[in-house]
């Protein structure tokens, strides 16, 4: 069953909507966590609508926040629970992206996903599996989930910018090179 994701919005500065940015927050946060970036970005992207959905599940280690899927080494969930959560979150996010584009009258070619940590994981999991390529993916401090399945399921290759600090103690810096090599195949 697909969950309709709650979302927050910043309208385009110009009032003319020609592109869409969807922010995907990290584990334990909510959509508002990244929405503040819209103020700075809208100066350079005045025709852009910014959306920031809350992930579909309440975070078990931070009940005030949300998670896209459970993370076993953080919350004690099983690998199976994590996989089921990822499948559900993928369906929910795909539906959110589709509905958002329809509501805004915009296409994949006018849509960018920007993620942080677990939000980057979702962007890299969903974006390349879309039949029509999105405008791009920008990811901070994330990784590719199941690189082998992405290679099998990849339908498009959106331009992707990945940024990752070498002192990250949550998502290893080595995840950046794995993502780079997977996305270039």
Residue spans of the language-model regions?
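Short beta-strand/loop motif that positions the catalytic acidic residue
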Residues: 161-164, 168
């Amino acid at each position: 069953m697909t969950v309709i994701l709650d979302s927050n919005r910043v309208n385009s500065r110009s009032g003319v909507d020609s592109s869409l940015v969807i922010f995907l927050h990290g584990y334990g946060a909510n959509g508002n966590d990244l929405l503040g970036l819209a103020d700075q970005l809208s100066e350079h992207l005045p025709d852009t609508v910014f959306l920031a959905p809350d992930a579909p599940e309440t975070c078990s280690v931070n009940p005030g926040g949300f998670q896209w899927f459970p993370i076993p080494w953080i919350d004690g969930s099983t690998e199976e629970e994590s996989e089921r959560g990822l499948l559900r979150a993928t369906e929910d996010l795909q539906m959110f992206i589709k509905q958002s584009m329809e509501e805004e009258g915009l296409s994949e070619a006018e849509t960018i996903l920007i993620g942080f940590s677990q939000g980057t994981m979702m962007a890299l999991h969903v974006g390349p599996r879309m039949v029509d390529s999105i405008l791009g993916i920008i990811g901070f401090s994330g990784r590719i989930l199941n690189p082998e399945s992405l290679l099998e399921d990849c339908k498009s290759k959106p331009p992707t910018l990945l940024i990752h600090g070498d002192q990250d103690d949550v998502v290893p810096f080595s995840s950046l090179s794995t993502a780079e090599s997977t996305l270039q195949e």
